[in-house]
């Protein structure tokens, strides 16, 4: 599989790049216009459904498009020749973009979704544990704590994936 991808890297890289551009543009348009209030009439894109779910789907499509763009850019520059300084700088820039998206944008958008439309705050109770588990004390977990646990899982999972990928690349 890897040999096939390497042999056809330009044939695969360019369409992947343009598919990513289309997904990014389409996702941003849907995410932007889905965020408007229900009764507000907007230009040409009034047909886009409103609410947090279409907005989140648009953000997911845009994020997926950004990943396709980066994959396409890597495939187009991938070669079996010795690595030059300029190509190393190019790959390090793409790596920096990827890490910025994963560790900056993705957790931020998750927190915006959880704190905004979903209203996962510390005042809302997610689960109340049985008192017999905690020596008769009442212990509960709020949606705010659940939101932070999910964000921590996203960041830590990505960090572990970066470590494993860095080990495998060497």
PLM feature segments, named:
Residues 1-68, 73:
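Transmembrane alpha-helical insertion/packing segments
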Residues 9-17, 59, 86-92, 151-155:
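Transmembrane alpha-helices of multi-pass eukaryotic membrane proteins
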Residues 18-28, 90-118:
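Hydrophobic alpha-helical membrane-insertion segments
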Residues 28, 32, 71, 75, ...:
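Short hydrophobic alpha-helical membrane-anchoring segments
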Residues 36-50, 110-143:
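Membrane-interfacial helical/loop segments at transmembrane boundaries in membrane proteins
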Residues 54-63, 128-162:
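Hydrophobic alpha-helical transmembrane segments
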Residues 65-81, 145-170:
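Transmembrane alpha-helical segments in integral membrane proteins
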Residues 69-103:
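Cytoplasmic juxtamembrane interface segments
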